[in-house]
């Protein structure tokens, strides 16, 4: 290459080294070059050539080069080449040049001879040719650096070399290069290049058979320098005798860089025919792994050794691929070929993960939510469910009693009688919609004892809530109506209590009604393992009348006696509080409010608490009477204010040291919950079902909003359990606690969904947006009405119904009392019209307080009017006493309409 500016890769090609080595040498010289395509100045290029040429010391006369890093590397490569050839990678008759093409080098002794040895030729063995060169071979002349493209037949590294081609004559030397047979200055006398076609000293006999092509044009001496990363050969090692080629120009001794030998593409550099040398260890390993890998769906996947892979429920293929160090795209393609359409980030069901793992010889273990949550807490050095300390730290706590039974058998009436309060009338339809927890004081043998009661719904839709109540309780009171007998939910309550290993006290209610037969109830319950004490069993039966208050004290005494006899109710009050969230709802003024039951430890105001995927700091605690509580001891139910979001009903709560820890635990639980929900609710589409999936199907999308988390969960479980035809699909795309917002309406509009509001109403702008977007919002206050209508809608068996037409809204500004008409509400009509005798409902913070009211009287100033329009004040009566300033009255009328 002519002197002057040159690019780095051109210099590397000229010097016979890689661009990376040239860049490293330039960096050592203080020249910082950016890339291999950068240009260097002429002085820099000259110094670089001198550096590569001068770095190779001239071999002493008759003395091999000192062993160093280069000989070790070349020796390893030569050994690898010999092993490959012995294993069948090369032919037994391959020339030493062939071995050199496979990446091998001449094997030299690692020791330096003390005295020069006479040049002798060693005849090669026809069985196992040695890849080394004759030690007496003379080096060839060093031509001027430049680029020379040899003929096809002149490439000693080409596998297509003809065996019977005559040995070509060596090319004539170019001007400026040493002539053949003339030693370079500083070179050893025995390093003359071999004569074409001749042997050294005539000591090498001709090889039988066809003549071989010449050896690789090797460099006299060391070949490439150590810095160049080339193969190392001792001094005096050149081309094999009889090859007709001179050794590789350049290299050691003279210090001038040699040119590339062989055709373009030799030594792994670009150009020429593709290299067909020895595979690297990495390539061999990859080929071996691919041969061993199992084929699943036409795709080669990693092969396991029976290892156990732990995956969370709802994990994706990306999560699985990370565990086994595989490509997620390969897993996706394998499932696609097997008829399963799943993306890499999509949650996958347990069966699919286990099947895919078994095909690859992996034991996939889907971690249960309980185990996963326990591992999560252990990562923060936390534990749940055990009392800290020893026996001396445990103190007696009140029993937690759950009232269970069939719907309308009198559970809430019994609790009313015990609490001396009337909470039954607040439930729509007289049916308990959510769980309530209360603590009452009972006199027993002159001492005051505390009992905590949990009221659970009896309707069939609340199975999950009854199961949670059984898990959080110590004793179960089974209420059975004496005139009705054992019903399906009665049997279910028995199963929940027995599954939780909870003692049962049976309260035979309504003994004051006609047709009551307590003896019949005892006989029926005997079939389910509840044998009365009078029959020789261990279950206490108490005949009561919740309405008349008969034998209530006897029932309380039976509860305490059962607790003292069968249970060891003790807890450590000196540890961080732990317990369970009984219910939770969103209050407009106070934010998320959760009713929690402290099971162990002491809960205090200011504690950092986490419950499920909600966290926060306890800002305020309120008991069942609305009074503030500073400290909550074990078995104490309180309302906790301070959560950042609404906890789920039945979620475990515990106190942690810092808000940061609570937030991290809640975030991880939230992500796990989303994945599990996506894996459970998403229906997979297989290739066999693709044709039917592309057809138009009847799908009902729902958005559920309720006043508390337990009710929303129960409603969703009941709706998803409706059995309909396969052509009709029910899908819940969102659920939440609180009023219906604009976000819910926008989601419903985008997904063609119907919004179900349970004991909640839509906000003002949300109603307008729903009307504008054509989104249907349906309101319910009794759960079985919602279930029945949704089921009828899915089955297409709906009869003509009455559609609600909203008339207007009015805000209560003042209250007046009258001896004639009772409580009068002074209102300002904010929208629409208020009409006399119209239906109305009372809202407080968008929560339905009263339903099915009627505007009995309506006055404007002192005149009786039939309606009052938007922007005017009026006075009206509803026939309902529990109204407050700030409440909203919503008037509506029912219009009969045919369903589509």
UniProtKB/Swiss-Prot annotation:
G2, as annotated region: 430-434
Major localization class: cytoplasm
Record's keyword terms, sorted: Cytoplasm, GTP-binding, Initiation factor, Nucleotide-binding, Protein biosynthesis
Residues covered by region (G5): 545-547
Positions contributing to GTP binding: 405-412, 455-459, 509-512
Gene3D superfamilies: 1.10.10.2480, P-loop containing nucleotide triphosphate hydrolases, Translation factors, Translation initiation factor IF- 2, domain 3
PROSITE patterns recorded: G_TR_2, IF2
Compositional bias annotation for Low complexity: 89-112, 175-187
Biased composition (Basic residues): 275-284
Compositionally biased tracts (Gly residues): 215-271
Domain tr-type G span(s) in chain numbering: 396-567
Cellular component, GO, one term: peptidoglycan-based cell wall
Domain of life from the UniProt record: Bacteria
Disulfide bond as UniProt keyword: no
Pfam families the record matches: EF-G_D2, GTP_EFTU, IF-2, IF2_N
A GO term, aspect molecular function: GTPase activity
GO biological process, one term: translational initiation
HAMAP family in alphabetical order: IF_2_B (MF_00100_B)
Role noted for this protein: One of the essential components for the initiation of protein synthesis. Protects formylmethionyl-tRNA from spontaneous hydrolysis and promotes its binding to the 30S ribosomal subunits. Also involved in the hydrolysis of GTP during the formation of the 70S ribosomal complex.
Protein name in UniProt: Translation initiation factor IF-2
Protein's gene: infB
């Amino acid at each position: 290459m002519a002197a002057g500016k040159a690019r780095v890769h051109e210099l590397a090609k000229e010097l016979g080294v890689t661009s990376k080595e040239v860049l490293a040498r330039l960096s050592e010289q203080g020249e910082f070059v950016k890339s291999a395509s950068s240009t260097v100045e002429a002085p820099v290029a000259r110094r670089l050539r001198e550096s590569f040429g001068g770095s190779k010391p001239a071999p002493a006369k008759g003395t091999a080069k000192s062993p160093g890093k280069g000989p070790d590397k070349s020796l390893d490569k030569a050994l690898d080449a010999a092993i490959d050839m012995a294993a069948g990678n090369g032919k037994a008759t391959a020339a030493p040049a062939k071995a050199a093409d496979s990446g091998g080098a001449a094997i030299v002794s690692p020791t330096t001879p003390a005295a020069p040895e006479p040049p002798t030729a060693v005849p090669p063995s026809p069985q196992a040719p040695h890849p080394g060169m004759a030690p007496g071979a003379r080096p060839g002349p060093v031509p001027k650096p430049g680029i020379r493209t040899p003929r096809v037949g002149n490439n000693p590294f080409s596998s297509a070399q003809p065996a019977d081609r005559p040995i070509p004559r060596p090319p004539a030397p170019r001007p400026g290069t040493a002539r053949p047979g003339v030693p370079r200055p500083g070179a050893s006398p025995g390093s003359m290049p071999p004569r074409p076609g001749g042997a050294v000293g005539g000591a090498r006999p001709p090889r039988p058979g066809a003549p071989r092509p010449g050896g690789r044009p090797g460099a006299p001496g060391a070949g490439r320098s150590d810095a160049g990363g080339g193969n190392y050969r001792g001094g005096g090692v050149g081309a094999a005798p009889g090859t007709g080629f001179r050794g590789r120009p350049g290299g050691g001794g003279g210090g001038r860089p040699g040119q590339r030998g062989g055709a373009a593409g030799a030594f792994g550099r670009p150009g020429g025919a593709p290299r067909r040398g020895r595979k690297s260890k990495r390539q061999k390993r990859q080929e071996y792994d691919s041969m061993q890998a199992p084929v699943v769906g036409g795709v080669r996947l990693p092969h396991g050794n029976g290892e156990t892979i732990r995956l969370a429920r709802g994990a994706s293929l990306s999560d699985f691929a990370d565990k086994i160090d595989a490509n997620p795209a390969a897993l996706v393609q394998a499932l696609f070929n097997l008829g399963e359409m799943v993306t890499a980030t999509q949650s996958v069901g347990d069966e699919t993960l286990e099947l895919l793992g078994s095909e690859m010889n992996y034991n996939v273990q889907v971690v249960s939510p309980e185990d996963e949550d326990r591992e999560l807490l252990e990562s923060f050095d936390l534990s749940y469910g055990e009392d800290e300390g020893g026996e001396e730290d445990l103190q007696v706590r009140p029993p937690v009693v759950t009232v269970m039974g069939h719907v309308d058998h009198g559970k809430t009436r019994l609790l009313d009688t015990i609490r001396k309060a009337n909470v039954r009338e607040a439930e729509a339809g007289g049916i308990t919609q959510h769980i309530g927890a209360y603590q009452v004081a009972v006199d027993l043998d002159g001492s005051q004892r505390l009992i905590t009661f949990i009221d659970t719904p009896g309707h069939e839709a609340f199975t999950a809530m009854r199961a949670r109540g059984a898990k959080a309780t110590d004793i179960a009171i089974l209420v059975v109506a004496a005139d009705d007998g054992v019903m399906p939910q009665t049997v279910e309550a028995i199963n929940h209590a027995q599954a939780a290993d909870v003692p049962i006290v049976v309260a035979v209610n309504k003994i004051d009604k006609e047709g009551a037969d307590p003896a019949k109830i005892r006989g029926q319950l005997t079939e389910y393992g509840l044998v009365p004490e009078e029959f020789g069993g261990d279950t206490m039966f108490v005949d009561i009348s919740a309405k008349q208050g008969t034998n209530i004290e006897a029932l309380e005494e039976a509860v305490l006696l059962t607790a003292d006899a069968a249970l060891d109710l003790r807890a450590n009050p000196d540890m961080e509080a732990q317990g369970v969230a009984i219910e939770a709802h969103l209050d407009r003024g106070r934010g998320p409010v959760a009713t929690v039951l402290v099971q162990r430890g002491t809960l205090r105001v200011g504690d950092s608490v986490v419950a499920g995927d909600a966290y926060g700091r306890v800002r305020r605690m309120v008991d069942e009477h609305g009074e503030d509580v500073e400290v909550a001891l074990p078995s104490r139910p309180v309302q906790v204010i301070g959560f950042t979001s609404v906890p789920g009903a039945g979620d475990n709560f515990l106190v942690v040291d810092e808000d940061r820890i609570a937030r991290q635990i809640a975030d991880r639980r939230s992500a796990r919950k989303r994945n599990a929900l996506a894996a459970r609710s998403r229906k997979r589409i297989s290739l066999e079902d693709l044709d039917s999936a592309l057809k138009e199907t009847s799908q009902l999308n729902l958005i559920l909003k309720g006043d508390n988390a337990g009710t929303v969960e129960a409603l969703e479980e009941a709706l998803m359990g409706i059995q309909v035809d396969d052509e009709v699909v029910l899908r819940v795309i969102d659920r939440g606690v609180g009023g219906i917002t604009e976000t819910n309406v926008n989601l419903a509009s985008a997904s063609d969904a119907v919004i179900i509001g349970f004991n909640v109403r839509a906000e003002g702008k949300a109603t307008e947006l729903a009307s504008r977007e054509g989104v249907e919002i349906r309101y319910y206050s009794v759960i079985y009405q919602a279930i029945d209508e949704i089921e009828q809608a899915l089955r297409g068996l709906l009869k003509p119904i009455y559609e609600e037409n909203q008339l207007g809204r009015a805000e209560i500004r003042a209250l007046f009392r009258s001896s004639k008409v009772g409580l009068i509400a002074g209102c300002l009509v904010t929208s629409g019209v208020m009409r006399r005798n119209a239906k109305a409902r009372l809202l407080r913070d968008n929560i339905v307080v009263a339903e099915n009211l009627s505007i009995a009287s309506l006055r404007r100033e002192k005149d009786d009017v039939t309606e009052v329009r938007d922007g005017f004040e009026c006075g009206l009566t509803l026939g309902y006493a529990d109204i407050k300033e700030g409440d909203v009255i919503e008037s509506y009328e029912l219009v009969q309409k045919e369903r589509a």
